[in-house]
A protein has these predicted regions:
Chain A
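N-terminal, post-signal peptide beta-strand-biased segments of exported outer-membrane/organellar beta-barrel
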Residues: 17-110, 123
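Membrane-embedded beta-strand positions of outer-membrane beta-barrel proteins
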Residues: 57-61, 100-102, 158-160, 186, ...
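Transmembrane beta-strands of outer-membrane beta-barrel pores
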Residues: 61-67, 104-108, 148, 162-166, ...
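Outer-membrane beta-barrel channels and translocator barrels
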Residues: 91-95, 149-153, 191-195, 258-262, ...
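Short, flexible helix-coil linker/hinge segments at the edges of structured domains or between repeats
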Residues: 114-126, 203-245, 277-292
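Long, internal scaffold/assembly segments composed of regular secondary structure
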Residues: 230-353
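Outer-membrane beta-barrel "beta-signal"
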Residues: 461-473
Length: 473, 359
């Protein structure tokens, strides 16, 4: 039971990291590799307590290094990351629980070519200058989840995530960026004795980003890209500023039924719909003007069918899902659409869990396709492609003895990337190894991960190495 | 309960979705311009369209290629599927016209700044003859060399005589203007008698360099790396009331400050100002400068949103949009003496100053 508890909370940690970082993504990606419980199916805080019954405290220190031997134009040559992560879960009484998380992360983007963004490609209106330099980012992130049973089997929960991050470039324009992000989710859930759970949640998120680029000499000219092919040269001035305001709302629903058709079959269905608006202002500190805005709107649906689950039997899981959204952007000066992007993403996967004595072997495969219709009207650029991807993986969990566990993962994948990767496909391969030992004072673990991305018919690769130490009690 | 909850959530989404902006009606890249170039001179009964005239569209918003095409026999040129943005439209052509002295070649210039409001745009630009030939403010070097200690004291200005006759600088004034023609910031005057003096001639097709200080900044301060050598300038500005104006070069004649109480050298805004060359018939700067006495006027500003300060009769636009302080760049007419009384069109930013010659 305790192991299940830890695993489920670690899943919470992973998902929270993905979805509630300094950029709030509107829709999450599902993978058959992960195990989803009632909470993290749509991040509904109403179900936190149903998945976790024992108090828990985890501490993690992690560091990573990524060498971009192959890179997009506005990517850094190397990324160094480090972070501290503290998580606690406590049952306050029989009906309520509280989970908190504090994360402090630093990252250093070395030899970053021109971009003043942490990820140039995540926005349609990205800021650049004309210098190459190192940019350091650092900041804390806080999360609080409160969960309570208000009536018999009727639950409610509130989750608040708040993060701040500051970035600084070491050469002119010495751009300083500050990003503030808030994410609030309120959820309701009902869980019957017969194993049927129904939930709904509403999410509001808001981000403010501020960039300040100063000028010393001539080279540091600031531009705002409109898409990826044309830019607006910002007026040369002593200080150029960019401000980003983004807010959005999403409603999600979920249904879970144990004993669906046959006793060992469970079905989980999740879906959501949301919209996000981004407004970008740029200019001098005294007269910033709207440089553009863009809106994303759409929804997703995901279904998981799980058979088995008891440790003594072979388990089987099937997943299928659809994500569909539409973006449109407009420059600030003129009431026209300058960028439009429609995405329809279909994914499906299968995994089987085979217990062999003290070993749990998981083998899985998933695939998907992203139907992209990206159009830049200002320069008439069209990227209309169906991008396929596939992944094969195996996870091995070994209980060496009563107090020690080992974990191995190996995966291979292939995906067709967007045009700005300038290659037809990328193959990835990765390996992860971890060991965890139980002591009288708690559990200490260490895990090591390597992942390599190799573009097709191109020189160079992206090599990622990471190591993490954890302490749980 | 479930029904009410779902209704509540959907209502909430609809409420918030309504707060977002509506999708615009038009896509970018479908702007069509149909431009006719016409020249009308009622005094001589001339009303013609300019055929085979090269029309240039320069995008003033985005970093984009310049579009060029030639007018047809109706004087019309069509540009299709352009991005929605501000364009500087220019055209020039030499026509054989009878302007009272027989048929002679006349250089006609047409220009306008176009702002899009609808998808299809049909309009006419009226060409005009060039501004009268004579002394022109040909180059303005104000931004300073590349440096990190805010050095800009190597400013200079260049005049050019575009006429076929000798011009005379005697008694002429050179002014830095305030926010209008009625507001004079600095006024400096050449020696000699205005209008009638003949001591300081400027030959046709020749340049005159006026330095803030006739000093070799390039070698003496910047070790020959950047900046300019102004020690051989034709004139230098001198203010007897400026105790800091120590670089008075004895080999270079002076243009003297005539503003009482003014204690600064002739230094102008690095990235924006208005300059006037006057014939010297009006030196009473208290009520501004008489527009009839203005020989040439140039307004420049690095800002694309700059609001005009000088009268449009003298200068319809402003040059130097995008020019960067401390870049070592300069602002010069497209061609020596090229003057349509629209500095937006007349001037281009050049990467380095050209002292006494055209780029």
């Amino acid at each position: 039971m305790r192991q299940n508890c830890i695993l489920s909370i670690l899943t919470v940690l992973i998902l929270t990291t993905l979805s509630d970082g300094y950029e709030n993504y509107l829709y999450r990606d599902y993978s058959v590799r992960n195990t989803y419980n009632l909470y993290d199916l749509v991040n509904n805080p109403a179900f936190l307590r149903l998945n976790n019954h024992e108090d828990l405290m985890t501490y993690e220190i992690r560091t990573g290094n990524q060498e971009n031997g192959y890179q997009r134009a506005f990517d850094p040559e190397r990324i160094e990351t480090a972070g501290v992560d503290i998580f606690s879960y406590k049952a306050l009484d029989e009906k309520s629980a509280l989970a908190t998380r504090i994360v402090y992360e630093t990252s250093s983007l070395n030899n970053l070519y021109r971009s003043l963004e942490k990820d140039f490609y995540s926005d349609y209106f990205s800021y650049t200058d004309t210098t190459t330099g190192d940019v350091s980012y650092a900041g804390p992130r806080l999360s609080v989840i409160y969960n309570r049973e208000i009536f018999s089997r009727l639950l409610t929960g509130l989750q608040i995530d708040y993060g701040i991050e500051r970035g600084l470039k070491d050469v002119y324009t010495k751009c300083e960026s500050i990003s503030r992000n808030i994410n609030v989710i309120w959820g309701l859930g009902y869980s019957s004795y017969s194993g049927t759970s129904l939930g709904a949640s509403v999410r509001y998120f808001d981000r403010q980003g501020s960039y300040e680029a100063v000028k010393e000499i001539t080279d540091a000219i600031v531009n705002t890209y409109m898409g990826y092919h044309i830019y607006y040269p910002e007026q040369p001035r002593s200080t150029n500023e960019k401000k980003v305001y983004a807010e959005g709302i999403e409603i999600d629903g979920q249904l879970s039924k144990k004993g669906f058709l046959v006793p060992s079959l469970k079905i989980e269905i999740a879906g959501g719909y949301g919209a996000k608006e981004n407004s970008i202002n740029a200019g001098g500190s005294s007269n910033p003007v709207q440089r553009g805005y863009w809106i994303r709107e759409g929804g997703f649906a995901n279904s998981i069918l799980t058979y088995g689950g008891k440790q003594s039997k072979i388990g089987l899981e099937l997943m299928a899902g659809l994500k569909r959204y539409h973006d449109w952007a407009s420059p600030g000066d003129y009431d026209v659409i300058n960028i439009e992007n429609s995405i329809t993403d279909i994914h499906y996967g299968i995994k089987t869990i085979i217990p062999i004595q003290s070993i749990s072997l998981t083998i899985g495969y998933e695939a998907g396709s992203e139907d992209v219709n990206y159009h830049e009207y200002t320069v008439d650029y069209v990227f209309d492609e169906q991008l396929s991807r596939s992944l094969i993986f195996t996870d091995v969990d070994i209980s060496l003895n009563q107090v020690m566990q080992m974990h191995y993962s190996v995966w291979f994948s292939n995906f067709e990337p967007w045009f700005y990767w300038n290659t037809s496909s990328i193959q990835t391969q990765g390996i992860e190894m971890g060991v965890e030992r139980l002591f009288v004072f708690g559990k200490i673990g260490v895990s090591f991960q390597m992942e390599f991305w190799k573009p097709n018919d191109e020189m160079g690769s992206i090599d990622h190495f990471g190591i993490a130490f954890s302490f749980k009690k | 309960m479930v029904k009410y909850t779902l209704t509540f959530f959907i209502g909430l989404l609809v409420l918030f979705s309504g707060c977002f902006k509506d999708i615009p009606e038009f896509e970018d890249g479908y702007l069509n311009l149909n431009i006719t170039i016409r020249y009308v001179e009622p005094r001589f009964g001339i009303d013609i369209v300019l055929d085979s005239a090269v029309v240039t569209l320069e995008n003033a918003d985005y970093k984009a290629d310049v579009a060029t095409d030639t007018t047809d026999s109706n004087g019309t040129v069509s540009f299709q599927e352009l991005p929605w943005s501000k364009f500087i439209v220019t055209s020039d052509k030499e026509e054989m016209l009878d302007l009272g002295d027989g048929v002679v070649p006349v250089s006609l210039i047409a220009d306008t700044v176009f702002l899009p409001e609808k998808e299809e745009n049909v309009f006419t630009i009226f060409a005009r003859g060039p501004a009268p030939e004579g002394l022109k403010i040909n180059e303005i070097y104000t931004v300073g060399p590349p440096n990190n200690f805010f050095f800009f004291f190597d400013q200079y200005f260049e005049l050019y005589n575009s006429s076929s006759d000798t011009a005379y600088l005697d008694g002429m004034i050179f002014c830095r203007m305030g926010s209008s023609l009625e507001s004079v910031t600095y006024i400096y005057q050449f020696p000699g008698e205005p209008l009638i003096g003949r001591e300081y001639p400027v030959a046709p097709d020749s340049f005159v360099v006026m330095a803030m200080d006739a000093y070799n900044y390039r070698d003496e301060i910047f070790s020959g790396l950047v900046s300019v050598d102004l020690s051989t300038a034709d004139w230098e500005f001198v203010n007897a009331a400026d105790p800091g104006d120590l670089n008075n070069n004895p080999d270079v004649p002076n243009i003297m400050n005539i503003e009482v109480g003014h204690t600064l050298d002739f230094m102008v805004g690095l990235s924006g100002d208005g300059l006037i060359l006057g014939d010297g018939s009006d030196v009473n700067y208290f009520d501004g400068i008489d527009i009839e006495s203005v020989v040439d006027c140039v307004e420049y500003s690095a800002s694309p949103t700059h609001i005009k300060e000088m009268p449009e009769e003298l200068d319809k636009g402003s040059g130097g949009v995008g020019q960067i302080k401390y870049s070592g760049s300069s602002l010069e007419r497209r061609f020596a003496g090229f003057d349509t009384n629209n500095s937006t069109v007349d001037f281009v930013i050049i990467t380095a100053p050209t002292i006494g010659y055209q780029h």
